């Protein structure tokens, strides 16, 4: 059992989504995260173990490499896609309640901004850490985010801005959320965003990388 979870974890870290994935070259033709997840479940490994001992460690390792400059956005995307390939087999267990979600994470790129790569990576990594992710897409207005917050009480919100010109919209959205749901956890990120800006607009946390967002969410929930 531990062997298949180790292999699954390694496939996520290496970005090996399935057997037909050409990368990495040394794993060409071998089962990827998709097949190994199915094999683990068929062998009787619990969905919780598949998530916590297979997917999460793999994403954590690639996240650490990203933080240290030993991996870059393309590698993160490949790993996130590998994790997503496995996650599709776990979603029915989340839906049935057999595997409990850590919480709900609502995310989007703010109004006026159509960039989504960073948001998508964060969404996939957070989902892989056991959260339900509600992805509202790009060019998202405050009203749409508020509707999601009201639909998912107690959720955390992640806002992304890749343009300096849309940072003002991020500030407006944070202000609107604070006015109606002051206890909501708000995370912000994106190329022009800084920790100082995060503090200035009243958000809870800034992280330059997906793994930092996951660590903050876990610690915030543990402290609640």
Language model: regions and residue ranges:
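Cofactor-cradling patches in redox/metallo enzymes
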Residues: 119-129, 134-203, 216
């Amino acid at each position: 059992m531990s062997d298949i979870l180790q292999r699954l974890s390694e496939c996520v870290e290496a970005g090996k989504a399935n057997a037909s994935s050409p990368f990495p070259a040394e794993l060409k033709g071998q089962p990827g995260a998709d097949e190994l997840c199915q094999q683990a479940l068929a062998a009787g490994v619990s969905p919780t173990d598949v998530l916590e001992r297979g997917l999460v460690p793999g994403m954590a390792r690639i996240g650490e490499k990203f933080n240290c400059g030993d991996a870059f956005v393309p590698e993160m995307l490949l790993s996130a896609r590998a994790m997503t390939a496995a996650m599709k087999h776990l979603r029915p267990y989340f839906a049935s309640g057999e595997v409990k979600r850590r919480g709900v994470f609502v995310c989007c790129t703010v109004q006026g901004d159509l960039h989504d790569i960073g948001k998508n990576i964060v969404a996939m990594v957070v989902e892989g850490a056991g959260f339900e992710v509600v992805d509202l897409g790009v060019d998202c207005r405050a009203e749409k985010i508020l509707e999601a917050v009201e639909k998912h009480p107690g959720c955390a919100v992640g806002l992304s801005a890749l343009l300096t010109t849309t940072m003002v919209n991020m500030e407006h959205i944070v202000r609107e959320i604070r006015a109606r749901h002051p206890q909501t956890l708000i995370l912000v990120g994106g190329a022009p965003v800084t920790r100082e800006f995060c503090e200035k607009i009243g958000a809870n946390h800034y992280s330059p990388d997906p793994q930092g967002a996951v660590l903050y969410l876990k610690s915030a929930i543990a402290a609640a």
